[in-house]
């Protein structure tokens, strides 16, 4: 501990103490703030939300990307929101945390709705399907405004890119790329 007297420095004076809690930090799978202590790499029986994410990831990501996520992080679930916390992150139990890691998505009706943050964190080689559009073209402008566009390819989730940079998600079905760009970010 140390005392910083007001007559010896500018300010009102301060008292500093370093507290150290004995014991080990536990990584954990968190559900509604309750720590379960299951690192992502050791997750044998995934909980609700993680199953949906893994199904989405198997169809969308390159296999090495999925293995890298599970190796380097811990799944955290708060309500219907799923996050990937960095490896070694201490428990957030009892804390109000805005984002405890990379937001992977939201579980809705037994399916995973992937987050925009995840799309922006990915690179072209980390996903199975991409739609790389010219940044000065009408198609990307329409996408950023919330519109759909025609696209040829296999049915599934696509990482929409503008000149090689991730922009968001799209879902191809029947030759039409459905827009999954966040409504709050769309241009008018």
Residues covered by each model-derived region:
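A C-terminal cap/extension of S-adenosyl-L-methionine-dependent methyltransferases
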Residues: 1-11, 20-24
